[in-house]
């Protein structure tokens, strides 16, 4: 039983539900639109006692009455009782009234008017089913009548003119604006779907913007927007519904291109210049114009001027005129012509706004030159600096300030920056009348003493003014003077020594303090002035009582006068401005304690307790400096001396001949009268000469004078002068003699002290020179230095060579040229023996020259036919001569005799009465005796110059050189040789091959 009851209850519940489901209010709709009716038929499903919400839609703008009833409501209770149907809502009992009506018996709902969807998109009708008592048998339901839309409304833009802006140079596809348009037709319907498009663009040309068809977004088409080309654009835009196929409308879009700083300002002129007087300020000296294509009166256009160089003194400023954008150059600091005659500025310009990112990388500062010429004006005078401070020296009493000179304070002429002239100085403000200034020199000094408690002394300083008046223009300049004064102590105590002199054995003395009044009272403190660190302490002081102290030396000090600086301080710690200087004499005392030596106390000395010492005076210092200057000038004076005998101007330049007083010095050569010709002289070293295995001579100092294939050999201690042609060879011996050779095969050789060996060949001319020893009557006791003779003859030879060709030769060898067998006027085909003397010169005067020159005249005339006998030196002589590294020693003693032979054939021989001795070294460096010098001239047609003679410094003082011409000879073939049979004999024969040279 218990399980049957729940099952019965469940069955009853299911039955009630079924009944309720099958009992409903049905609404039927009818219409001519099948698809819509099919939609509404879905509402016929059974619901639990609910009204159907939808009715057949009605199209707006049409007469829908032909579709009545548009809906029908039915209640299930209609079958059992009378039901009355009623409707209410907008369009029924609310405005607009009477659009819908219902048949109260059948429930048919009819439309009676044309509806507008834009006014009422849908109608909500409340449906009720009433019984006879007027009570609702059904729950009221809402019936919705939808109004179908037609495309009766065009799109409407929210603005008739849309305004937008975009920066120039913006990137493409940048959003400019969004257009807004609406359509009154049903939303989300094709009738309200609007499509946008650009109808036109002003200015026309390349399309610059893109309009989105669906969203209405206006974007840039390119990145080439340029405000300088087009500052704004006007677009005509169309909006059409039904996605561009329906109704359309238009609007206007104005797009402004915003300016950016993409243009650099540029100066209109490449340079600027102006003039201004010095010492003048100017609010507008110059204007600079610039060109900027950016939008005017914006920060992109507004220029900012600045200096790049030249304004280091901050004389100028540049201000921008906001109306014209010009730069105004101002002078804010006066210019001085004396310091700056012209100013060269460099200016540049930029904009107030930063440059746009699209061009900032291309910006470069470009400077424009500006020249400012400063005009000089007469400036007058001024005090520089405008004030000056003077300080009164410490220790000066306020009662002793009269005529105390502080210094000078002169005005400056600003045109010259020097002390002004023609200026009169006067005092301006001079409180208390303490100061006075000299009207000419500007010297400031005190004219009266002052009281330190004076009201005119503020902070220990007196202030006054000085006026400088220009006497020409009357202009006045003012300067301020500050005088700092110390604390005057007019009653400081005075230190007095008990005695002025003390003994050096016990240098001590008592010092006492005294005052002029009782203002400063004891006890007094005594102290020595601080000494420099470099000076050790010499004195010390010890207080004895309230007014005195003991001054003593700390170490043994020498006698003298000492100056000691002492500082006194009273009980109130007041002291004098300057230390007191004490003078103390330290002296040597005798056993009685009395000074034995007195030192002047008035002489100046060194402070800090040191004795004064002597010092050099100005005269002594001047003499020292003069001596140093003379030492410095000595090398310079040596440069002006004539050192050496170099010729500078011909024969006479630098050459001094031997005085005429020297007897037998030299024979004149230039008697022939012909003109000399210079020849180059080559010095070579002569190797050893060997004849049949025997060495005749070696010498390290034997040199040859070679010209025209000839060779001359000079010995170490002899002299040889030769002139020849062909293969002529001469050799100078080792001991103060020389030989001369002839042309052709003639040879000469000398090898002994005081010996001359001469030879001549066939048909030639040989000239011999004999050297005869002698003495000078003025210099009989001395010997001429051979260094001097060597230098003398060398200089004379060079002087002759440098002589002008047009000048007649007076002292040089003259060579006969163009001589031969065909020569006219000569019996032998050449110059006759002494013919030039016999024809042109009366030589009878030679007979009266005295015995010394008698022999010389005979030799010159060719009268002498025998060799002269000369006495050789008493000592054996020998020389070691080195030639090219080979030593040789030659010695000859005895009487020497030289003879010259001539003939058509054969040879010449010279004989001596001596014999050849072994080589012996001679300790005596001097050579004594007579020496033979022979010289040979060639008879060929070439010109030959004499060689430079080399003299041995060991020869005797007086040397007589003679010359003789024998006769012309012809060349004899053969080489220079010494036959074996002649070795060791007293007579030697020398031959020479004219076509070969000495080897």
Swiss-Prot record:
Matching entries from PROSITE patterns are given as: CADHERIN_1, CADHERIN_2
Q: Give the location in the cell.
A: Cell membrane; Cell junction, Desmosome; Cytoplasm; Cell junction, Tight junction
Expression by tissue, per the entry, reads: Expressed throughout the basal and spinous layer of the epidermis with weak expression in the granular layer (at protein level). Expressed in skin and mucosa (at protein level). Expressed in the basal layer of the outer root sheath of the telogen hair club, specifically at the cell membrane between the apex of the cells and the surrounding hair club (at protein level). Expression is less abundant between the lateral margins of the outer root sheath basal cells (at protein level). Also expressed in the tongue, tonsil and esophagus.
What Gene Ontology terms describe what this protein does at the molecular function level?
calcium ion binding; protein dimerization activity
Instruction: Indicate yes or no for the key word Flavoprotein.
Output: no
UniProt induction comment: Induced in the hours following cyclic mechanical strain in keratinocytes.
Q: How does it assemble?
A: Homodimer. Part of a complex that contains DSG3, PKP1, YAP1 and YWHAG; the complex is required for localization of DSG3 and YAP1 to the cell membrane in keratinocytes. Interacts with PKP2. Interacts with CTNND1; the interaction facilitates DSG3 localization and retention at cell-cell junctions. Interacts with CDH1; the interaction is required for CDH1 localization to developing adherens junctions. Interacts with RAC1; the interaction is required for DSG3 translocation to cell-cell junctions, organization of cortical F-actin bundles and actin anchoring at cell-cell junctions.
Kindly provide the name given to this protein in its UniProt entry.
Desmoglein-3
Q: Which organism is it from?
A: Homo sapiens
- The protein's gene is named DSG3
